[in-house]
């Protein structure tokens, strides 16, 4: 019995450690995202209404407290660990090109469905990486280390969201909230069938010249 409880606790600790990678504004804005692990005594899943970037509750599937609305996708998965989150740097670029880039994880793309029960069967199968169009991603594996590896591979796309609309965007290009705001603006512009009008290389370079000392200092000290 003691050994079983230790195994269960280790599984939960592994889940918490993996989740720490995606508990940030770029991966899980707001209260979005949910994670789970299947252990010796059943399924443990993030409680509804808790944020991944804060200390969150992991509850047993039979707990009286409300589990995530998307518990179906976790229960239907054949894998031990399931992590669903909403990386703002991946959602805008979901396409067939990502299937080639992440082919070793047997990825697939699922067309948009309403979050919740409509997505309950999307985790069925051998796909360790699932792209949910206009929604997010699902990472699943029997190995905690492989889940961590997939998350790290996806995170390589974080630096690619660098749309410079105005001088302060360029200066604060590594600020998470600025990146989030720019991604939102970009999606809004594209959804309106408008063209992005960004700062060019010459304009960006000029921001670091003496007549932009204020921003040059910000750039140097941030």
Question: Language-model features: where?
Answer:
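Glycine-rich flexible loops
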Residues: 1-222
């Amino acid at each position: 019995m003691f050994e079983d409880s230790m195994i269960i606790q280790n599984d939960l600790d592994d889940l918490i450690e993996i989740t720490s990678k995606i508990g940030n504004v770029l991966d899980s804005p707001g209260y979005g995202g949910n994670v789970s692990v299947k252990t010796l005594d059943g399924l443990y899943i993030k409680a509804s209404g808790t944020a991944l970037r804060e200390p969150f509750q992991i509850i047993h599937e039979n707990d009286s407290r409300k589990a995530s609305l998307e518990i179906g996708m976790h229960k239907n998965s054949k894998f031990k660990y399931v992590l669903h989150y909403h990386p703002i740097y991946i959602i805008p670029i979901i396409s067939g090109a990502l299937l080639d880039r992440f082919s070793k994880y047997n990825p697939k793309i699922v067309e948009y469905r309403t979050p919740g029960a409509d997505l309950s069967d999307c985790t069925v199968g051998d796909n360790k990486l699932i792209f949910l169009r206009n929604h997010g991603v699902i990472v699943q594996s029997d190995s905690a280390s492989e889940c961590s590896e997939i998350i790290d591979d996806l995170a390589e796309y974080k630096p690619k969201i660098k749309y410079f609309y105005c001088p302060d965007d360029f200066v604060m290009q590594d600020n998470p909230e600025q990146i989030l705001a720019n991604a939102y603006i970009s999606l809004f512009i594209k959804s309106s069938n408008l063209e992005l009008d960004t700062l060019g290389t010459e304009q960006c370079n000029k921001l670091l010249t003496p007549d932009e000392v204020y921003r040059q200092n910000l750039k140097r000290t941030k």
